[in-house]
Amino acid sequence: MSEEKARVDNAATGDIQHQGKDIFFAAVETTRMPMIVTDPNRADNPIIFSNRAFLEMTGYSSEEIIGTNCRFLQGPETDRAVVQSIREAIDERVDISTEILNYRKDGSTFWNALFISPVYNDAGDLIYFFASQLDISRRRDAEDALRQAQKMEALGQLTGGIAHDFNNLLQVMGGYIDLIGSAAEKPTIDVQRVQRSVHHAKSAVERASTLTKQLLAFARKQKLQGRVLNLNGLVSSTEPLIERTFGPHVTIETDLDPALKNCRIDPTQAEVALLNIFINARDALVGRPDPKISIETRNLVVDELANMSYDGLLPGRYVSIAITDNGIGMPSSIRDRVMDPFFTTKEEGKGSGLGLSMVYGFAKQSGGAARIYTEEGVGTTLRLYFPVDEAMLTHAEPPKAVDRRIGSCERILIVEDRPDVAELAKMVLDDYGYICEIVLNAREALKKFESGSRYDLLFTDLIMPGGMNGVMLAREVRRRYPKIKVLLTTGYAESSIERTDIGGSEFDVVSKPCMPQDLARKVRQVLDGPNGIA
């Protein structure tokens, strides 16, 4: 915006009535663009002039608005932040251009493209504020319609992809379970055949679990177990994975910054993200002469001026890792969609279209960003950014093996609205030496306690029908019995336990699906913990 101030002739006094013959105001009066002038030297900065276009746009008469402040255009849905920015610009005597939802006299709304500028006389005195306006409702409606259409297209692609992949997995699980059932009815059991069926069914379950984690990663809803690590170390630890992914015919180069700062991310999800990038790079290299991959790490400072160049990263210090291939690259039409869930250019069965969307979601949920640079026929670079963490490196201990009989006959109340899920949890925990009872909702659970039953652990689902969720139940039971241990479970992974409308961060949680040994380990940790938080 130019620093040159708008000026009028020194004869201008601030009284618009004396300027009726001025060619400027004659032009303003006849233009089709709505315009008003206000007087900042009078109390409440009132309107002192409006042209016919403004009156037609708002439905008011000149007599109704002259001498009043412009706030009559505001209504209940007007953005207060935009109003505040306008006030600040007026206080600071600077130009402002914005879009605001305004109200006509009849109560109907319109989107107003507003430009306000101070006007000075030759002596440098502020005498007016000049505001030009434009009804842009049609443009905003068209933009909203386009966004809705795009959202519905994305939703259709997402739900179609989910249904396709889960139907395939359900086919595998159901088919092999039927084979196991048929084998159990025969007088002699082919143990190897049953074991193969069990293996394939479990493999399908694991793939389904991976699919939900990828979806949650894209939506930034997965539960991340962040710890301090160095990306250089992450690259070194995944070298065997890199070599297996690309094979001996691909040249792998690394350029790792020896002074690279640490970051705090989930190491398991980070490895999965890198694997997804490696797989896409490998597929892009098929048939290319002299295929090559380079891996680079760097420190980076993002300032306020540059943050939009880094996908809106907050100003601060970051570390980055970039994977570059000299593969086929992508046209812009594919580049712009490559991180959408279930978008894939691969043939059926070769990819789910969730790999890079998982990478994007993981980076975002970790406080960073993922950016892709590509040129068709030249290659692709995918760069991840994570905030610097000055804490020292930590090393996670491997989980200890779980004894098949780790329970000591502790009593557990299982609260789960799905009977099949509840029965499975009971069978698992019974096998580990616990005494379990099942109820299907929170009200039944409270009745159990009120009848005098005593339990060492309340194991409850988080989301349940009936008006009382798992957190509400846990808090009520803990209020009555402060020493009871509590473990929540949810299929929603991360944010249902931390959403402000549910809460519950004071309790430990185990995510579904959960392997029997993992559930047993978590139950033991909670029971042995001082306050039920492992």
From Swiss-Prot:
Residues 20-93 form the PAS domain. This is Blue-light-activated protein. Keywords: ATP-binding, Chromophore, Flavoprotein, FMN, Kinase, Nucleotide-binding, Phosphoprotein, Photoreceptor protein, Receptor, Sensory transduction, Transferase, Virulence. It comes from Pseudomonas savastanoi pv. phaseolicola (strain 1448A / Race 6) (Pseudomonas syringae pv. phaseolicola (strain 1448A / Race 6)). The modification Phosphohistidine is found at H164. FMN binds covalently to cysteine after exposure to blue light and this bond is spontaneously broken in the dark. Residues 94-148 form the PAC domain. The modification 4-aspartylphosphate is found at D461. NCBIfam families: PRK13557.1, sensory_box. CDD domains: HisKA (cd00082), PAS (cd00130), REC_hyHK_blue-like (cd18161). InterPro entries: CheY-like_superfamily, HATPase_C_sf, His_kinase_dom, HisK_dim/P_dom, HisK_dim/P_sf, PAC, PAS, PAS-assoc_C. It catalyses: ATP + protein L-histidine = ADP + protein N-phospho-L-histidine. It is an enzyme of class 2 (transferase). Its EC number is 2.7.13.3. The lineage of its organism: Bacteria, Pseudomonadati, Pseudomonadota, Gammaproteobacteria, Pseudomonadales.
